[in-house]
Amino acid sequence: MTATTRERRSQSPARGAAAGFPSQPGGPDATPAPAISNECVFSALGDPAQAVQSLARELHSRRPGQAPAAVVFFCDGLYPLQALADALSQRFSCPLLGCTSGGQIGPGGFRRGGLSLLACYGSGLRLGTHLIEPVSQAESAVERIARALADRPLAPGWRRFGLLLVDGLHQGEERLAHALYHGLGDVPFIGGSASDEMRFEHTPVYFDGRFRSNAAVFGVFETSQAFEAFRVQHFVPRRERLVITEADPERRLVIQINGLPAAEVYAGALGVPEAVLSPELLEAHPLLLRMGDELVVRAISRVTRARALLCMSAVETGVLVDIGDAGAALEALQRGFDAVESRIGEPALVLGCDCTLRRRQAERDNQLGAIGDFLARHRVFGFSTHGEQFNGLHINQTFTAIALAAQP
């Protein structure tokens, strides 16, 4: 299943505690900037200063005399994070956007551990970052972002999109994504919840020289290139008619389905006893919610002692849900990328947020190498997440991405 959002021509307001945008390229009649130019580098070194130094050396060897205009990075949460933040902020004077990850995606496909970094060069892509802290203050933060963007009109032919990075342990993504989408309107965005290899211990985001918990950073990119936001998931519905008759969205609990304990109904639909509802089985059969013509995924984390289903995104009382069966993940990606490329051409860069559960399923299916190779061939730079955002939605077990065209 694939959903897309094409770039939008008119732009609306955005935010407050902010870092970055370089000056506008010329006045209101400025011509579009050159095509996007970037380099992806990776270090497995465990010492943060050495890791950053090695990446800076590699970038210098590829682009002697050039400094990046923007940097996006994803890192292992086991680094001493303040030391890493210090090394990054000392080495790079441009806007920085990053967080801890459950693994990275880049030219080498999927990677675990270490530090991955995307350096963007030239004036074809600009980045400004906006802090939302704490996550619960989403609405007031979005108002500040909106005012900041309204004060910065775009040159003709330029557009904006967003990349949201949010602490994956504070369960505020639904409210945050909704606030951003409705508060900014014409800024399509994707996002990912910071991860830590499923340890669920510490998943901070980076802003202005340090890593911050219970926070989010909204990166606003400006470009004259065509782009498209899209998402891909590979689950097909079983055609079960299930009604959520009791839920606790704040705690992401589904308590009853069709008036019975949720675990009982779920297991019955799968034709198995409740006792065998293992993490692997739950991951293979998430809940599916229909929104218009699209299906969105709600991953199930575990069955509680009270026989409720603890989900990784909120589910409301009264909604109709189905149960998904896993289809072919690689083929779903191929269809998604084919559709996007038919509209904007071959991308110069794809920023991607891919659920850690998708990677785990690929490992179990012996497909990790093939899927990683596919993403590398399609110039994806991104990370494995605790959850994904797509415009106003917080979802699970999905690949969300922004593809930037090689041509304007």
Stretch-by-stretch model annotation:
Residues 2-408:
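Hydrophobic alpha/beta core scaffold segments
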